[in-house]
Amino acid sequence: MIGKIEIDEGKRGRIIDKAGHLADEVGAKYMSCAPATFGAICDAFRSEDIELFPPEIQEAITQGMIGLHGGVAMTGVGTCGAVAASTFLISYVVGVTTEELSKDDNLNYAASVPAVEYIIDRFEEDYGAIDCLRVRYNRVQRAFDLMDPDARILEMTFALYEKDKCGMNAPNFEGGRDQTPPVRGARWAAEAICDLLGMEPEERHELPPHLRGLGSQDMEPKLQKVVEALKELGWGRPNEKISYREYRTFKLKGKKGLEQKRLGSVSAPKGKE
């Protein structure tokens, strides 16, 4: 766990700007949002003598971050790599240990609240999404499944043809590069981390009043009577295990309908031998 570190306004501003510039430079070098965002944030703090990870640990984590690029494994369907990397670092600085979490699972909120406040809400406001495909489409009206080689070619063509719109390595930092998800994610995460480092470690674990008492350890004894009443009513069909594909059949035809063979399960007729 990282202890409290006083960061004055000058140093804070330099860290945030450095994180943004590095995210652009490294993002263009790697063409990979998650490792670029992660590395930019770590190196920005190191430039002001604040080490989040030793270099060898940072390198090891960066290798893992590569798989989170492009909406997880370059498919586009998962979370934006810049969001994932930023959230990872914020959670790390909040510093909830596994031992603490095993005693109070409500501490999941401690790592989540600042990530939502500084990263998720801002991505939703600026890009209308946090998943890779929609972030890219809403930003530049282009989005591809990068596992498709043709789509990869189209993406690179767009990046070279529309440099200012793409943003990577655009001449004007504020007008161009500052638009990109790695840059904004790195800047916003750096801002969050500066604020978190200004707190004592215990303060980072404090929750807003409306999220307190929601851990399973607190709720289970209070909810046990409710659970027993629901079981008596048969609510939720606790003994039924059906897939979402079977749910409509269940509603229309009941359990008997599920037990009947579907058309697709009938064996194909054998051909003449």
Residue ranges and their predicted role:
Residues I2-C33:
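Polybasic, low-complexity association/targeting segments
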Residues A19, A23, T37, I61-H69, ...:
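Short alpha-helical scaffolding segments that buttress acidic/His motifs in well-ordered protein cores
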